[in-house]
Amino acid sequence: MLDYLKIRRDLHQIPEIGLEEYKTHAYLMQVIEGLTADLDFVEIRTWRTGILVFIKGSSPYKTIGWRTDIDGLPIVEETGLDFASTHEGRMHACGHDMHMTVALGLLEQALSAQPNHNLLFLFQPAEENEAGGMLMYEDGAFGDWLPDEFYGLHVRPDLKVGDIATNRGTLFAGTCEVKLTFKGKGGHAAFPHEANDALIAASYFITQVQTIVSRNVDPIEGAVVTFGSLHAGTTNNVIAETAFLHGTIRTLTQEMNLLTQKRLREIAEGIAQSFDLELDLELKQGGYLPVENHPDLAGELMDFFQKEDGVELIDIAPAMTGEDFGYLLSKVKGVMFWMGVDSPYALHHPKMTPDEAALPFAIEKIGKFLDYKVNER
């Protein structure tokens, strides 16, 4: 039997950025190959740092998929743990070490006997930075292993161990990264008429873009437009030639995301024209679509966990956090859910420390659900 604590702590020490998860890939492959040795109903494929493990069913008419992400974040860890990150400036601050450990535990359980239906385990790279699920799908990595149903989880620090939370609709927002540069003409502060101030234009833009949420978005639907970074100018008496802004759009529907992108572009172009500036605008959504659960499958999963002893099933509201599993769920029906890990620190916090008691709980309870799915007639 796998030592879940050791695996989680080993993985926690080697966080890597998306598409650079080389040590993580090697570690996972070693465990997977050990579990699947001499089993003739298992095949393994790799895609860059990603791994696909396909368990062939004895009499399949569908394929069930379980997805986990494997990458870390560019964060300096401050947990003080004995098994803290050994990679400088890298941390598993989003719980992907927990996700991988759960997936390996589920794989071990699933291999105890050949199931009726096919079961695919996806160890997906680059959730945080490059939408690895989209990259794998577009590159044909799944081939004929593409599931008919896809499932996955994400740890949630503000829920306690034993909590499973999801809903029958949108669970995560769709996100879009925004990078914008206004370029004018620099000059001496004493001669503003000889320059063209990009900083003033950026200020007008920041103010006007707030009207997207307040006047263009249906208040029942909601949206977020946040610019967290503005860089312009060099000193107090020089007019800024350029102004760079970096922000994010978050919405609960793809239609609203596209509308928000459209209005942001129109405002930026209008500001640039009115101030006679050059504009460089990049809107990057990629694979970060809203995570939309399939209503019937979500209802089935919720009913299953509602009946499980030791599980507190929560019908939860959507969150404005992003997740690239939304792309795969736009191609394959499925469900994502939150798993409580009871940490006082939020996801992406340098002190985020999940309760490891969630590991055996998740492997037992989710293992039962997967067993039900792959053996139903």
Curated annotation (Swiss-Prot):
Q: Does the keyword Hydrolase apply?
A: yes
One Pfam family from the record: Peptidase_M20
The record ties this protein, via SUPFAM superfamilies, to:
Bacterial exopeptidase dimerisation domain, Zn-dependent exopeptidases
Reactions the enzyme catalyzes = N-acetyl-(2S,6S)-2,6-diaminopimelate + H2O = (2S,6S)-2,6-diaminopimelate + acetate
Q: Does the keyword Amino-acid biosynthesis apply?
A: yes
Protein EC: 3.5.1.47
Pathway of action: Amino-acid biosynthesis; L-lysine biosynthesis via DAP pathway; LL-2,6-diaminopimelate from (S)-tetrahydrodipicolinate (acetylase route): step 3/3
The entry's keywords = Amino-acid biosynthesis, Diaminopimelate biosynthesis, Hydrolase, Lysine biosynthesis
Name the active site residues: D69, E128
What processes in GO biological process is this protein linked to?
diaminopimelate biosynthetic process; lysine biosynthetic process via diaminopimelate
Q: Please give one Gene Ontology molecular function term for this protein.
A: N-acetyldiaminopimelate deacetylase activity
Q: What class of enzyme is it?
A: hydrolase
Please describe what this protein does: Catalyzes the conversion of N-acetyl-diaminopimelate to diaminopimelate and acetate.
- Cross-referenced PANTHER family: N-ACETYLDIAMINOPIMELATE DEACETYLASE, PEPTIDASE M20 FAMILY MEMBER
Stated family: Belongs to the peptidase M20A family. N-acetyldiaminopimelate deacetylase subfamily.
Q: Report what the protein is called.
A: N-acetyldiaminopimelate deacetylase
Q: What is the lineage of its organism?
A: Bacteria, Bacillati, Bacillota, Bacilli, Lactobacillales
